[in-house]
């Protein structure tokens, strides 16, 4: 599963160096991930209805080239099948040239909303959707 | 009731003009308000326990002078007694000179969390605490 | 001059009440304003080339109904002709029903970037573009 | 070199799960880093005076336990001597119990502000301050 969304860099995301402040890419990644999850009917609301939340447990980001005000950028989110975690890889690209601005990865763990217990394997129906094809 | 808190302007709040982005003052105002509310045991959690939320219904901000990176600023929050709304006035000042950077006002309305109904008068115990002295 | 843009409410803009945190509407307003300004070739970069910045000097916001996660909203930005300030009015609407979520107004003043002096009248070419029809 | 700062978790940093949104820890890390840098007279302004900017090139974050509204947290920032990069490690701790909420690492590279060229070794005076002792 993968998904591309386009974002136009807003003014309020810039820092005094006239580039996107590095922490704001985390927002772009979340927008990409939520768009992919919506495509497979796994919005946060649906996850909650199944009784689980999926907090991010690790995040790695590599910054390649800065994004500028008004620039059209693509967030390409790719799901990585895994039985234990919800794993996504991200590429943030310039929309015109598709040159890489940023690459990243996040890992999310299922938490039972009632008991607050962590799940070391994805519970159903998440295992079927995200667990890969053995 | 009034309260002063000190904030050191963080880098991530700046915009490309090297000053605090105007929308970020809303965060400073909320920090001032929450500090004042905590002093009178009216944290958001306590409000929720009493069954009410207090969304902001109007906000006015006047920007006088920009705040810069690393600047020590004071948020002075003053409660304005009122029977219908939770009203606060704010002054954001340079800590060293107390010169004015920003003045603002917010109005919050009580909402019954269960019924989602708006309260056109402050419910108890908020009326006693915030309603003024007549 | 007016302009409508569509925004899908992102997760990271929500607060614990499951609605958009009130300060985040300021970002939506800026995106609407920048889209309108781009349409008349008055991006912030162009303003800077003419030697002026336009900090927001006053802002008023009225919150009518909360916006939710994933909701499609419209920011309708309308320029109000004025010789002294850059004035915009905003309506934030539900995209499906066009019911009002938020109305707002901002006023921006021209500042000479070199001298840091405020302009009590819009300088050219801004006066011609934004000053109205007399 | 190391530095501890205290932060009280503000309401606007929370997400609908009533915990700090994962992207906001990046702000806490920056506040810790800037406090440490100020202690050794290496604020961003001073870096700029020397002709260099230090964009973050990689960031890794591991989330251990969520931070809540009003919680007092400590950001412990430790400089890791290195000749090529400005490297910091972070621990975000509950202030009362010092239990770990989050650990992270960032790497920053020197960029010559005039030429926009990356420096594969720290330039002076940064090499002396941050390069370690051999």
Pin down the residues of each PLM region.
Chain A
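Hot-dog-fold acyl-thioester-processing enzymes
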Residues: 1-56, 111-134
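HotDog/MaoC-like acyl-thioester-processing domains
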Residues: 3-5, 68-69, 80-134
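Hydrophobic beta-strand-centered segment that forms part of the acyl-chain substrate-binding groove
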Residues: 36-87
